[in-house]
Amino acid sequence: TNEIYPLNPIIGLIIQSKVNVSIPLSNKFGKTKGIFQPSEGSYVLLNWFGGGHPSQTVSKKILKGKNKHFRATLAASEIIFNGAPLIIKNPWNCFRISSIRKLLPKAKFIWLKRDIRKSAASDLESRYLTKKNPNKWNSATPSNIEKLKLLPPVHQVIENQFEFNRSIKANLKNIPSKNWITLWYEDILEDTNVELKKISSFLNRDYKFNTNKNKIKKKIRNISSEEQKEINKYVNIHSKRFKENLY
C-alpha cells in the first residue's frame, strides 16, 4: 500500500484484505520485509500531511484539500476490515496529535515510551544505516533543529528524542485520558502478551495474540561503545530534565 498505492491506499488495503498471509512483526527502523507486512505508511502520510523540515512546524497539519480523502480512506478501511481499528505508527505523528484530534475527535492515541538512552542509541544507529552520516537526521525533526545541529551527534539524538516526548506530552494534556494510553517498550519486551492485552482492551478488541518472549531477539546496537557511553553520560548529567523518559 505504502510503496505502490500511496495516493490511493484503499486499493492496497482491498488487495491485502483478500489475501491470507502470515505477518511477522519484526522490523528494522520501521521497515519490514514483504509487500503485505506492517508499514509506517510514510508515503501515504506524506500525501496527506506533506513533508519538509522542521516537521514540527511545516508538517503538523493536514494539507489543504486533503481532509476529505483522509476521512474517506479511514472510513473505507474500517468497512474493509470489519470494524477493526486502523493503527498508524509513525514518528512524524508525534507532532500531529492536535491536528489528528481535530480531524478525528474519537481517535485514540498510544504513547509508546522507551528509555531515552536506548531510543537515542537507536536514533543514532539509524543515521549511520540510512544516511551514512551521524550528522543527518533520519526522520521527523523538532522546531529547534537548527539549535540542535550545534551539538555533537550523540547529544543531538538525545535532545531529538526529548523533543518528541515533550511534544506528545503537551498535546495529550488537551485530550481526555480515556482516549490515550501510555506504555513502555521495555515492558513489552518483558511480557509482550500482558502489554498487548492492554492495547487490545484500550481499543475494545479481543486479544488473540500468543507471543513467546523467548523468541524475541535482543538487538545489539551498531554504534561504538564510546558513543553509547557518551549518551549515558549526557543523560546522567541532565537526569533531572530527562527523568520522565528514563525507564
What are these regions (language model features)?
Residues 2-86:
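PAPS-dependent sulfation machinery
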Residues 4-6, 92-95, 115-119, 125-128, ...:
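Short, solvent-exposed loop/turn segments at secondary-structure junctions
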Residues 62-70, 89-92, 156-164, 191:
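Soluble or luminal CAZymes and related metallo-dependent hydrolases
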Residues 81, 104, 175-176:
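A structural signal for short coil/turn segments at secondary-structure junctions
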Residues 85-89, 182-184:
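Short catalytic-loop micro-motif centered on adjacent basic/acidic residues
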Residues 124-247:
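PAPS-dependent sulfotransferases, especially Golgi type II membrane carbohydrate sulfotransferases
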